[in-house]
Amino acid sequence: MTAPPPPPPPPMPSHWHCYRWTGERRTYDDESSRRPPHLVVQDISPQEWQQIAAASPAFMASEVPPLEVPHWLLRPARMIKATFEAPDKASAWYRDQVSDLSPSFLTDHDKNSARQADWFAAADDRLGWGGDIVGGWYLRGTGFASVQVVACSPNRIRPTIPCPMR
């Protein structure tokens, strides 16, 4: 008896939205504005996602990265720093952001060019199959920086979250 064929792979996203946040660590550590008001463990309709997001003005107004990466897509489009249809363009944006932030990284370990080359290779790979990229670094002083590239239309983790640009 033969095994059934594997399911088809999820569709590739039509584009990626890019987000960057830099701020105080204590702001980043306060999770109250980083999550929508209801824990959702399954996919729901696009309309239900919008209702959940609208029920939390603090979540919608916060530019601090959400706890779940696809939840960026629930926030207003004005928070998007860039949008790319091609994964290589989204990866180049990520590299540029990390390179810009690198002199401010707290640790020499994170400033290491070989380590960063590994991050960039992983980003290229992840975007190549339709995934998201998430990077976060402690900065000198009391800062924290986050750079995220989020697949959209659909996102693999939350395919029913609607695009914030529509």
Give names to the regions the model predicted.
Residues P13-E24, K81-T83, G136-R140, F144-A151:
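Ordered hydrophobic segments in well-structured contexts
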Residues P66-L73, F84, A123, I133:
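Residue-level detector of functional hotspots within protein domains
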Residues S62, D100-R166:
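Short, mixed-charge low-complexity intrinsically disordered segments
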Residues P9, S14, Q42, E85-A86, ...:
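Intrinsically disordered, low-complexity regions enriched in Ser/Pro/Gly/Gln/His and often acidic
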Residues E85-S102, L106-T107:
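A short, charged, amphipathic alpha-helix used as a generic interaction element across diverse proteins
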Residues W16, W21, W49, W72, ...:
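A residue-identity detector for tryptophan
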Residues W72-A92:
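A short, exposed loop/beta-hairpin motif centered on an aromatic-Gly-Thr core
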Residues T2-R78:
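Short aromatic-glycine-(Arg/Gly/Cys) micro-motifs in beta-strand/loop hairpins
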